[in-house]
C-alpha cells in the first residue's frame, strides 16, 4: 500500500504540469495560510452568537 503512494508521488513529481502548480498559485499563498483558521473562527462566531442571545 505504501508503494502506491510512492508511485503516485513519483508520477506527479515528473509531470511538468504538477511541477508548475505551486509557482502558478503563489499569489494565493496568504489565503492558503489563513484557511485552516476559518473553522476556529466559525466556532468562535457561534459561541459569540449564543452569548448574545443568552444561550437559549
Swiss-Prot record:
Residues 1-19 form a propeptide. Its main location: plastid. Coiled coil: none annotated. The chain crosses the membrane at residues 35-55. It is found in: Plastid, Chloroplast thylakoid membrane. The keyword Disulfide bond does not apply. The keyword Transmembrane applies. It is a single-pass membrane protein. One of its GO terms (biological process) is photosynthesis. One of its GO terms (cellular component) is chloroplast thylakoid membrane. InterPro entries: PSII_PsbK, PSII_PsbK_sf. Belongs to the PsbK family. This is Photosystem II reaction center protein K. The lineage of its organism: Eukaryota, Viridiplantae, Streptophyta, Embryophyta, Tracheophyta.
Amino acid at each position: 500500500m505504501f508503494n502506491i503512494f510512492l508511485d503516485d508521488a513519483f508520477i506527479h513529481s515528473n509531470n511538468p504540469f504538477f511541477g508548475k502548480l505551486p509557482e502558478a498559485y503563489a499569489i494565493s499563498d496568504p489565503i492558503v495560510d489563513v484557511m485552516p483558521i476559518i473553522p476556529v473562527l466559525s466556532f468562535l462566531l457561534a459561541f459569540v452568537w449564543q452569548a448574545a442571545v443568552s444561550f437559549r
